[in-house]
Regions:
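Short amphipathic helix-loop junctions that connect adjacent transmembrane helices
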Residues: 58-74
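A late C-terminal transmembrane helix in Major Facilitator Superfamily
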Residues: 143, 153-192, 200-201
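Helix-to-loop junctions at the C-terminal end of transmembrane segments
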Residues: 89-103, 190
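Juxtamembrane intracellular "pre-TM" segments in multi-pass secondary transporters
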Residues: 11-43
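C-terminal membrane-cytosol helix-exit motif in multi-pass small-molecule transporters
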Residues: 1-16, 211-215
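C-terminal transmembrane helical hairpin of 12-TM major facilitator-type secondary transporters
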Residues: 104-151
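Pair of pore-lining "gating" transmembrane helices in MFS-fold secondary transporters
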Residues: 35-55, 139-140
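Intrinsic disorder in cytosolic terminal tails and internal cytosolic loops
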Residues: 103, 215-233
């Protein structure tokens, strides 16, 4: 059904070429991607947050049931709150993108993720907190994901209209690797304490905020935005 919908409604604007060997084309696309500092900035803002939310997904059941004593049924409802937070974030982002620039929205996302992560860092330091405080910050982190990742993707791909497909694949692959690494690390270090349950999410969020503050060094100057026509061959 999805393939039929794409064939029926999606108009291809790019003319494919087979003048270059696929392997060389992939290598040249990697070089092109990492030659743009704006794309590197966008990549960092995209690939780091999954390490945080995948880490809490990996240990949330154990934390909720073992540490806080909720039942499995209650955990299902609690976990659903994180998913609802993403949905709400997506809805809010849909309204915000018509009123603010991508960089402003990335700044908003960085600020919100810092607010959540700073509190999680305090919780990790104390190694004790009421459940509502922990899960509120987890949901705030997830709410921010919907704003941060979508706008960072636009920033990362804007300088690369001719290799946008390969560029998005590069980002997606690295994102999955980092997310899986966060989940594996969380599973390894989890020892039944609140500290080790939230420390990765807290660290990643603080790192994302630092990267945003370092944007003038990572990608100095105004962000590049190409008109749609450049993507049409």
């Amino acid at each position: 059904l999805m393939i039929f919908g794409i064939r029926a409604n999606l108009v291809e604007t790019h003319v494919p070429t087979n003048t270059e060997h696929p392997a060389r084309q992939l290598v040249s696309s990697f070089r092109e991607f990492f030659s743009h500092r704006q794309s590197i900035f966008g990549l960092l803002m995209i690939v780091l947050p999954p390490a945080g939310f995948m880490s809490i997904i990996a240990v949330s059941a154990a934390m909720t049931v073992e540490i806080y004593g909720f039942s499995i049924k209650q955990y299902g409802l609690i976990f659903a709150c994180a998913g609802i937070a993403i949905l709400i974030g997506s809805t809010v982002n849909r309204w915000l993108v018509t009123r603010f620039s991508q960089l402003q929205l990335i700044g908003l996302g960085a600020g919100l993720i810092f607010a959540a992560s700073a509190q999680l860092a305090v919780i990790a330091y104390l190694d004790s907190a009421p459940f509502w405080w922990v899960w509120f910050n987890v949901c705030l982190f997830m709410f921010t994901i919907a704003i941060l990742l979508s706008n960072s993707m636009v920033v990362a791909l804007d300088p690369l209209p001719r290799i946008a497909g390969v560029a998005s694949s590069i980002i997606g692959t690295i994102q999955n690797l980092v997310g899986a690494s966060g989940a594996l690390l969380a599973a390894v270090i989890y020892d039944g304490t609140i500290r080790n349950a939230v420390i990765i999410m807290a660290t990643v969020g603080l790192l994302v905020a630092c990267i945003f503050l370092l944007r003038p060094l990572i990608a100095p100057g105004d962000l590049v935005h190409h008109p749609d026509e450049l993507a049409r061959d």
